[in-house]
A protein has these predicted regions:
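A structural signal for small-residue-enriched, beta-sheet-centric alpha/beta enzyme cores
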Residues: 1-230
Length: 230
């Protein structure tokens, strides 16, 4: 009974990045030692999975009107190789806004009242300019991993540039209802241009976001992209 009160339970405050998914599933379920060991074992299999696994299990998008009209999301992955340069992205998509594919098509987010199509989160926001209480426990967490050689300062810039991928794929994004974060890591194998890697990182992050939507499964009474009827 110790920690920050989030309504349905209390969460211990430690240094971390996490999504708020406690309204989905059993609020009292917690990771244990056996799950941690299994996660380490699975990491050695080199069989990356996406969708409603790991951090993506309880992820949702399009929550301006609450859980009743949002959609199921998940964990997304994407990777590219240009010459010797390798770059991968992973994202847990738990966004306040709507989601678009790399061609600009809306693929997930706020559903209309009878759930026969999409509504626009942005347009819903414009119905009133007065301060309002919104579903503000949203976070999209991503990471970029590259074999390019970069120090901490340059990786910070790459992470910053990668947020362009969020902006292309999520709207609205970076709101006060979001806790959007991106980490950048380097294994330091080859020389690479920072501007090129930063620009490419945004593109690959957009690909990972699309994957998070298209690989998710309907569950907990929430509809996923795969099961849309329109």
């Amino acid at each position: 009974n110790i920690g920050f009160d989030v309504g349905v339970t209390k969460v211990p405050l430690v240094c971390q990045s996490c999504i708020f998914d406690l309204p989905v599933g059993d609020v009292f379920t917690r990771p244990d030692k056996a799950m941690a060991i299994k996660a380490c074992e699975n990491a050695e299999l080199n069989e990356p999975k996406s969708g409603c696994v790991g951090g993506g299990t309880g992820a949702t998008v399009g929550k301006i009107l609450g859980a009743e009209r949002c959609m199921k999301s998940g964990l997304g992955i994407a990777c590219v190789k240009i010459g010797e340069l390798k770059l991968g992205a992973v994202v847990v998509l738990n966004a306040f806004g709507d989601v678009f594919d790399t061609n600009g098509n809306r693929i997930a987010g706020l559903l209309n009242e009878d759930k026969t199509g999409f509504s626009s989160t942005e347009e819903e926001m414009y119905k009133s300019i007065q301060p309002k209480k919104q579903f503000n426990t949203n976070t999209t967490i991503g990471a970029i991993i590259t074999n390019g050689k970069f120090d901490k300062t340059k990786l910070n810039k790459i992470a910053s540039m990668t947020h362009n991928g969020y902006a292309r794929s999520i709207n609205p994004v970076h709101t006060m209802a979001d806790g959007d974060s991106i980490y950048a890591l380097s294994v330091g194998e080859i020389e690479a241009d920072l501007n090129t890697v930063g620009t490419l990182s945004a593109r690959v992050m957009s690909m990972a976001i699309e994957n998070a939507i298209k690989s998710a499964e309907s569950m907990y009474g929430l509809t996923a992209y795969k099961d849309l009827k329109f």
